[in-house]
Amino acid sequence: MEKAINIARDFLQVDIAKSCHHGSSDFSTEFLRVLNPIATVISSGDDEPYAHPRPDTLGTIGKYSRGERSLIFSTELARSGQEFLDLSKRKETDSTLERVVTVYGMINVRTDGKKAIIAQKLEKVVGSTKWDIHKLEWNEQKEAFEYIM
């Protein structure tokens, strides 16, 4: 199996992967091993009942990604439900205010072929920035992108 995975990487290895189906647990470990990305983006958070991305999916992506600090980005940042809100402590009683709030992240990927930037929009501005930015640079010797901390 290892030989087949290494041969397949010559044709299918990627630097940045986009996870299929919101990070569900319906995936092939062997396929993830072949992809061997340095970063993976998971689009999730469409107010669905499946708890995507799944914990086993996140673990497997991390385990079979390359680099000491592989990157996993998910558009799902936070959710709150009515069972967690204590409205009796709020002074506002305006019934038109929305009480259940869902916030999703926005992820941008940009590259010129030698550098790549993956930026995730923050929920709140920190200092003067609205983005959490991660940089990848092309390593000529390894012929692959590397995460620059």
Q: Which residues fall in each region the model found?
A:
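Binuclear metal-ion centers of metallo-dependent hydrolases, dominated by the metallo-beta-lactamase
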Residues: 39, 46-149
